[in-house]
Curated annotation (Swiss-Prot):
Keywords tagged on the record: Cytoplasm, GTP-binding, Nucleotide-binding, Protein biosynthesis
A GO cellular component annotation in the UniProt record: cytosol
Function: Increases the formation of ribosomal termination complexes and stimulates activities of RF-1 and RF-2. It binds guanine nucleotides and has strong preference for UGA stop codons. It may interact directly with the ribosome. The stimulation of RF-1 and RF-2 is significantly reduced by GTP and GDP, but not by GMP.
Gene3D superfamilies for the chain: P-loop containing nucleotide triphosphate hydrolases, Peptide chain release factor 3, domain III, Translation factors
Residues binding GTP: 17-24, 85-89, 139-142
Keyword Transcription: no
GO biological process: regulation of translational termination
Disulfides per UniProt: none
Record protein name field: Peptide chain release factor 3
């Protein structure tokens, strides 16, 4: 198979949702169809101990939430599928946003009983900004939920995206009978031994079923007033195909997968800092680090840099340029993933996600190139933290473990580190409280370093140029610090303190991140 043919087989997507909409469950079902797991059952399993395949970190298993992005790969129907299962919890939106830079499409999972929720809306905005295709899975049809027409209306009114239903539920909850498959013009049956029936057979099966009559009325209404199906509009991110189903009972998931793979885009190009796009079929290898994860195997205390291959082909042992440091690195120990299990990989192509063992060489956002190519891709989004805590080692004898843990967790992008210019104190910044809890848990369990954390409350953060730096600017209301890249930054007590500073030092430019 040629390189071009291999690249065209790739389908790389992220699954986004509000917490508890069923994102991890549908991930398990997709892996089941891909032959990667033998059974897919109730995913959370807090009481039973049946943990989700993609929730591998200890704290995720304890709390039943996804706090890191898992990467999984399988083959199905002639396609090589790369799934990125993103954190649903809002405190981990940084990791999710960066992950969304590494995919070509997104699957949006919505709880049909609740409709569009806050986190779904946030994540959709990021996807919309990138103009990548969105495929919607309306989940939990095995329970009573909202009317299907209301759910479609919500997509258009709240998210501002046109929708096209690929299938339509026949009843729901205890009265759920199956799906009327508009795209394939057939019925998918929830009960009985047969999976599918023709529309003519459906008229006989559900002759006296009031829900079936309602379905036919809804479909007639949609054919007259609904949006037209357009593959072009889907690929441009202007139209979302909507699939109904139940991930928990594995109903409608396989149909979704098969249809998704038919319409999901091939790998796309990526912009360099000069605005030029590097295309997947370019023969020279290039990629970027979108995530770093420490301790995926606690026995070995390892670090993995997750790389999205943008162009060309990876071959084991190849040397790459790291433009940020002007140095080169050899890619000899590289893996691909199925959540916590992994295997060595000898080659991979544009669209694939690979894991590079990292001894501290890489940072999130790094570009990897080969030969004389030493360009950089556009930077990944960075986020301004909102709440802060001072942190120190509880046991002075554990300073080495303490510093190693902080260094690795900060490089992951899981939390941000600031150092007080005058006192040298460490301060952690996060977008939500859960990040601090996870940091503390991981420091104690993965690095054997207990920590003392003292709240500093909310701060307004602004960066300044090193040329404008004057330590006399610092006060109790605006703490002068440096970030992990040694860039000077002020932590203002509130917006009033920020305005006061701006008035006093009008020539100092204050910069804000996302």
């Amino acid at each position: 198979m040629t390189l071009q043919e291999e690249i065209k087989k790739r389908r790389t997507f992220a699954i986004i949702s509000h917490p508890d909409a069923g994102k991890t469950t549908i991930t398990e079902q997709l892996l089941y169809f891909g032959g990667e797991i033998r059974e897919a059952g109730t995913v959370k399993g807090k009481k039973t101990g049946n943990f989700a395949k993609s929730d591998w970190m200890d704290i995720e298993k304890q709390r039943g939430i996804s706090v890191t992005s898992s990467v999984m790969q399988f083959d199905y129907d002639g396609k090589r599928v790369n799934i990125l299962d993103t954190p649903g919890h809002e405190d981990f939106s940084e990791d999710t946003y960066r992950t969304l830079m590494a995919v070509d499409a997104a699957v949006m999972v919505i709880d049909s009983a609740k409709g569009i929720e806050a986190q779904t809306k946030k994540l959709f905005e990021v996807v919309k900004h990138r103009n990548i295709p969105v495929f919607t899975f309306m989940n939990k049809l095995d329970r009573d939920g909202r009317e299907p027409l209301d759910l479609l209306e919500e997509l258009e009114e709240i998210l501002g995206i046109a929708s096209y239903p690929m299938n339509w539920p026949i009843g729901m909850g205890k009265s759920f009978e199956g799906l009327y498959d508009l795209y394939n013009e057939r019925l998918e049956l929830y009960k009985g031994e047969e999976r599918f029936a023709t529309l003519a057979e459906g008229d006989q099966l559900f002759a006296s079923n009031p829900f079936y009559e309602q379905v036919k009325e809804d479909i007639e209404l949609l054919s007259e007033a609904g949006n037209e199906f357009s593959e072009e509009a889907i690929l441009e991110g202007k139209l979302t195909p909507v699939f109904f189903g139940s991930a928990l009972t594995n109903f409608g998931v396989q149909t979704f997968l098969e249809t998704f793979l038919k319409f999901a885009p091939e790998p796309h190009g990526h912009k360099k800092t000069d605005g030029e796009v590097v295309e997947p079929l370019s023969p020279d290898f290039s990629g970027f680090v979108f995530k770093i994860q420490a301790n995926m195997d606690p026995r070995h205390r390892d670090r993995i840099a997750f790389v999205r291959i943008v162009s060309g082909e990876f071959e084991r042992g190849m040397s790459v340029n790291l433009p940020r440091t002007s140095k080169s690195a050899k890619l000899s120990n590289v893996t691909q993933f199925m959540a916590e299990s992994r295997e060595n990989v000898t080659n991979a192509v544009a669209g694939d996600i690979i894991g590079v063992y990292d001894t501290g060489t890489y940072q999130v956002g790094d570009t990897l190139t080969v030969g004389k190519n030493k360009f950089e891709f556009e930077p990944l989004p960075t986020f301004t933290p909102e709440i802060f805590m001072k942190v120190s080692a509880k046991n002075v004898m554990k300073q080495k473990s303490f510093h190693k843990g902080i260094e690795q967790l900060v490089q992951e992008g899981a939390i941000q580190l600031y150092t007080n210019y005058q006192t040298g104190e460490y301060m952690l910044g996060a977008v939500g409280q859960l990040q601090f809890e996870v940091f503390k848990h991981r420091m104690e369990n993965e690095y054997n370093a207990e920590v003392v954390m003292n709240p500093m409350g909310k701060k307004t953060v602004r960066w300044i140029s090193p040329d404008d730096l004057d330590e006399r600017m610092s006060s109790s209301r605006n703490i002068l610090a440096k970030d992990r890249f040694d860039q000077p930054v002020f932590l203002f007590e509130n917006d009033f303190a920020l305005r006061w500073f701006a008035d006093k030092y009008p020539d100092v430019k204050l910069e804000e991140k996302m």
